[in-house]
Amino acid sequence: MTASPSKLAQLRELSVVVADTGDYDAIKRLKPVDCTTNPTLVKKALDLPVYADLIERELAWGREHGGDDRTATVNEVADRLTIGVGVKLAELVPGRVSTEVDADLAHDTQATIAKARKFIAMYAERGVSKDKILIKIAATWEGIEAARQLQKEGIDCNLTLIFNRSQALACAEAGVFLISPFVGRILDYYVAQGQTPASIDEDPGVVFVRTVYNEFKQRGSSTVVMGASFRSTAQIEALAGCDRLTISPDLLEKLDAEHGELPRKLSPAQADNAQFTPIDSDSFASGLAADPMATEKLAGGIDTFAKDLHALRKTIADKLAG
């Protein structure tokens, strides 16, 4: 008797599966279409043997080229390591590698644009074309405006930390390539408020992604919806059929070990009727202000990303000094 396909195998037939990791071996094993990096994942990569040559090369560059401005040297080495890890990952996946712009720049449109252009140029110098890369930007108003300009330049963007409909709609209007609504962090907020959902169909993170997906499909938006920040395989299964799903290695492993039918939950053909209301900076701000969860989680997410970046830079500074 032929064994039934795993739930991961079935999911691959319904959604593009993305690995939320920079773990080289995990990506080789799990074979996602896309993958993503961030400062935390790059910091973890510093301890992986596969990146040892890259790390030594970039630290040597920092020691040789570092001037009197130690901070600038550390920051440049962090950028070079980030791109170096991305280059290695681009060799493994047939699709895209998301590379995160500094969270410190989340409220600075021009600085975000400049850093994105720099990253794309660094990738090009290392033989990776921009069509292999997504520039990951926090979905503040300033970040969305940066993405609007970058998209016009042919630089595709992944707008992350999406918690609110205003953010999602503003991204679609800006022509953003992809958005990442954070399923698990939305659930975390409501559970902390004592509002645990009775079923997966009432999970506020799942409901949010389904709503955004349906609105985008009904409107004919080309912006890709990629569910992110999952806490369980149940959340993933509840969004089977979403354009893309970025999943941690441990949950990918669980899905690969599970069998049984995995039905499609989202489909363009089943999208609800929806009309978009134009979003400007004022309506964007008021939409966030009226949503305590989104306000808290967006600010907290940016803060966490910034702390992770500073931790990466501190590790690099220590290695350069060692």
From Swiss-Prot:
Question: Which PANTHER family did the record assign?
Answer: TRANSALDOLASE (PTHR10683:SF18)
Enzyme Commission identifier(s): 2.2.1.2
Q: Which residues form the active site?
A: K136
Which controlled-vocabulary keywords does the entry list?
Cytoplasm, Pentose shunt, Schiff base, Transferase
Q: How does it assemble?
A: Homodimer.
What is the protein's species of origin? Xanthomonas axonopodis pv. citri (strain 306)
Q: Which GO terms describe its molecular function?
A: transaldolase activity
Q: Pathway involvement?
A: Carbohydrate degradation; pentose phosphate pathway; D-glyceraldehyde 3-phosphate and beta-D-fructose 6-phosphate from D-ribose 5-phosphate and D-xylulose 5-phosphate (non-oxidative stage): step 2/3
Reaction catalysis annotation: D-sedoheptulose 7-phosphate + D-glyceraldehyde 3-phosphate = D-erythrose 4-phosphate + beta-D-fructose 6-phosphate
List the signal peptide residues.
none
> Where does it sit, as one GO cellular component term?
cytosol
Which compartments is it annotated to reside in? Cytoplasm
Q: Which domain of life is it from?
A: Bacteria
For biological process, the GO terms are:
carbohydrate metabolic process; pentose-phosphate shunt
Kindly report the protein's main subcellular placement as a broad class: cytoplasm
* Protein name listed in UniProt: Transaldolase
CDD domains named in the record: Transaldolase_TalAB (cd00957)
**Briefly, what is this protein's role?**
Transaldolase is important for the balance of metabolites in the pentose-phosphate pathway.
Q: Which family does it belong to?
A: Belongs to the transaldolase family. Type 1 subfamily.
